[in-house]
Amino acid sequence: MAERLNAAAWTEIGLRVLADQGVEAVRVEPLARALGVTKGSFYWHFSDRRELLDSMLVHWKQLATHDVIETVERASDEPAERLRELTRLVFRHGGPLDRAVRAWASHDDAAANAIARVDAERYTFVRRLLEEHGLPAEVAARRAHLLYTSLVGEQHTSLRLSRKRRVDWALFNLESLLDLP
């Protein structure tokens, strides 16, 4: 495996460990053991742990924001259906990793800045979809805030519920926001 190992492999395992155990568990030696390589392999790709953590934030933003937006945009021509798909995708992919990045952001400026940029980008996307659905800009802005914070909150407060139940509730919230005058 070592001959095929690249920086992306380190970043991906770092994200898995982050989602499962938190940022403090993202350490070079345990990651190297998990990958079946020496620490030297790590330093071939990264100068230090901070560089790996920064790479993880970039990759997380791509996976959890850009890739999701691209998938949603391809899902339908109808803004309401794209919002439904976005809601489903949030619960299909986002939970543990997003929660871990938010926890990390509570004590790390780089992670906090990444969260702020991602939140702004996601909010703007939701607002645009609501405007395309026909809501006036000011109403769309307020409902985008409600919807986005609801989706983020659901990932933290309903952990004991089944994914299907959480998606059903989130879709109900979405439909309520779309139907209100």
Predicted regions: what they are:
Residues 13-21, 67-71, 101, 146, ...:
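Solvent-exposed, amphipathic alpha-helical segments
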Residues 9, 13-51, 55:
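Helix-turn-helix
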Residues 55, 69-99, 147:
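Hydrophobic alpha-helical connector segments
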Residues 3-17, 31, 56-60, 64, ...:
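Generic hydrophobic, amphipathic alpha-helix propensity
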Residues 49, 56, 60-64, 75, ...:
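Hydrophobic/aromatic residues within well-ordered alpha-helical segments
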Residues 96, 100, 147-164, 176-181:
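Amphipathic C-terminal alpha-helical segment
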